[in-house]
Amino acid sequence: MFPGAPAGVFDAYVKQSLFPSCFANGLPASEARMLAATQEPLSTIALSQQSGVPAWKTIPSWAVIGTADHVILPAEQLAMARHAHAHITEVRAPHLSMISDPGVVTQVIVEAAHATG
């Protein structure tokens, strides 16, 4: 639990033993272990907070779909991206595509920046 947290609110982590096979599948084992050991917690309070009006309703969206993602099913990612009318790029990558395939992710960011000026 973090300092000053309301009662019943905790920090959540992915078990280090599971992290390599779900979040970091496809990455070198040493890198996956390092990422597991240094992961930042998710406050469980975030799981019950309203997010507000989705930005994709008013601004263009881009999505990088990791087709080897073991955290969020690629079909679900694709459905969400289509719902948001996003420009979609698929890459054979795990959940951490920004680490496994930084060139692809960077290119999508650059394209989005150029398109939105």
Model-derived regions: residue spans:
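Conserved short-loop catalytic and cofactor-binding motifs
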Residues: P20-F23, I65, A93
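Short, hydrophobic alpha-helical segments
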Residues: I109-G117
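Conserved loop-alpha-helix segment in the C-terminal half of the alpha/beta-hydrolase fold
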Residues: T67-R92, I99, V104, E111-A112
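Helix-rich cap/lid subdomain of alpha/beta-hydrolase
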Residues: M1-G52
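Short glycine/proline-enriched coil/turn segments at helix->beta-strand junctions
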Residues: E40, T58-I59, R82-H87
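Small/polar glycine-rich anion-binding or flexible loop at a beta-alpha turn
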Residues: P54, H95-M98
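Short beta-strand/loop motif that positions the catalytic acidic residue
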Residues: K57, W62-I65, D69
